[in-house]
């Protein structure tokens, strides 16, 4: 299951992600963050961390450097 989600993230990055202008306010980008979180923490915690990050990525958040804990 974890590998399926990682593959979907890669599919997003190399297809849809190339069609829309970059707008992530953080470094690493939200898709990279989700990938790193899944690899480092596993499926449940990785998804939780990634979703929290995506919800913080909006115009009213300053963004900046935000590594995977």
From Swiss-Prot:
The keyword Protease does not apply. It holds the Pfam family YidD. One of its GO terms (cellular component) is plasma membrane. SMART domains: Haemolytic (SM01234). HAMAP family: UPF0161_YidD (MF_00386). Keywords: Cell inner membrane, Cell membrane, Membrane. This is Putative membrane protein insertion efficiency factor. Belongs to the UPF0161 family. It is found in: Cell inner membrane. InterPro entries: Membr_insert_effic_factor_YidD. It is a peripheral membrane protein. The keyword Protein transport does not apply.
């Amino acid at each position: 299951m974890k590998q399926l989600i990682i593959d979907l993230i890669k599919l997003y990055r190399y297809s849809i992600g190339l069609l829309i202008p970059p707008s992530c306010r953080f470094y690493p980008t939200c898709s990279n963050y989700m990938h790193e979180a899944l690899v480092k923490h596993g499926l449940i915690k990785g998804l939780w961390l990634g979703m929290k990050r995506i919800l913080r990525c909006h115009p009213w958040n300053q963004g900046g450097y935000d590594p995977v804990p």
